[in-house]
C-alpha cells in the first residue's frame, strides 16, 4: 500500500478505478462511448486539483453528467468501486480524503439531479 500524495499515484487510482468501471455490468454501458485517451487525463487533472491543489482541472463536471440516464444505483456502485479501488491500493490521510470527496460529489450530483428523496 502506498500514500496518495502525487500525480503518479492519482493516475494509478484513476486508471485502476476505470478498469473496474469498464468491466462493471451496471456502469460500463454509461461509459461505452467514452474517448478514454481524452477522458483519463481530464480525470487525472480533476483529482489532482482536488487532492493536490494544482489547479490543472478546468471544467464543469456536473454539466457533463446531466444528459446521462443516472440513477441512485449508479452512484452507489460508482462509490463502491471507487472506495474499493482506494482501499486496495492506498493508505493515509489523502486516501481517506479522496473517499470523502467522492462521497460529497455523489451526494451533490444526486441532489442536483433530483435523485434524492
Where do the protein language model's features map onto the residues?
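Core of compact, soluble alpha-helical bundle domains
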Residues: 1-117
Amino acid at each position: 500500500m502506498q500514500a496518495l500524495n502525487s500525480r503518479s499515484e492519482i493516475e494509478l487510482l484513476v486508471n485502476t478505478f476505470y478498469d473496474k468501471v469498464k468491466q462493471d455490468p451496471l456502469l460500463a454501458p454509461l461509459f461505452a462511448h467514452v474517448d478514454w485517451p481524452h477522458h483519463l487525463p481530464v480525470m487525472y487533472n480533476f483529482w489532482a486539483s482536488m487532492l493536490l491543489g494544482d489547479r490543472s482541472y478546468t471544467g464543469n463536471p456536473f454539466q457533463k453528467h446531466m444528459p446521462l440516464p443516472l440513477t441512485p444505483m449508479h452512484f452507489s456502485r460508482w462509490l463502491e468501486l471507487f472506495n474499493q479501488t482506494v482501499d486496495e491500493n492506498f493508505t493515509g490521510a489523502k486516501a481517506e480524503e479522496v473517499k470523502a470527496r467522492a462521497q460529497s460529489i455523489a451526494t451533490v450530483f444526486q441532489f442536483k439531479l433530483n435523485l434524492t428523496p
